[in-house]
A protein has these predicted regions:
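Periplasmic OmpA-like peptidoglycan-binding domain that tethers envelope proteins to the cell wall
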Residues: 19-23
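Flexible glycine-/small-residue-rich
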Residues: 8
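Active-site-proximal helix/loop segments of hydrolytic enzymes
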Residues: 2-4, 12-14, 25-136
Length: 136
């Protein structure tokens, strides 16, 4: 069975414009909602904690090793003049990873089913995220 590192945001100081809490709060709620599905499908996972940072989460995943996938749950902020007007979901993957692209496409397809603006869900190749060692 697959093993993933589940990494919801640790940015407590990034409040949502809607007043619904911080990025850390909301992304941890999303991770909480994912856990039953992971358990139900036999997917093993390790999860970071809110007192960690992005860097320490990546370091822990690298130190523990053996993960098939690193799932970072984050929301992006907008510049003050765009605050509250930018929407959508970006699913990032490493450009030369066929399996990473396939996983990103699967996530995006399922997110389109539940996101209120499915046309704003897309996959994006990138090399500019936190550096993690290649899984397995």
């Amino acid at each position: 069975m697959p093993k993933i590192y589940l990494s919801p945001s640790t940015q407590e100081s990034n409040p949502y414009i809607t007043g619904s809490g911080s990025e850390e709060y909301n992304m941890n709620r999303l991770a909480d909602a994912l856990e039953p599905y992971l358990y139900a499908n036999g997917i093993r996972f390790v999860r970071n904690t809110p007192d960690m940072t992005a860097a320490s989460s990546i370091a822990q995943a690298n130190r523990l090793g053996g993960f098939d996938f690193y799932l970072a749950l984050h929301s992006n902020a907008a510049a003050p003049d765009n605050s509250g007007s930018v929407r959508g979901v970006l699913v990032f993957y490493y450009p030369t990873s066929a399996e990473g692209k396939r996983a990103a496409e699967l996530f995006a397809a399922n997110l389109k089913r539940v996101y209120p603006l499915p046309d704003l869900v897309r996959t994006v190749p990138t090399t500019a995220l936190g550096e993690g060692r290649q899984p397995k």
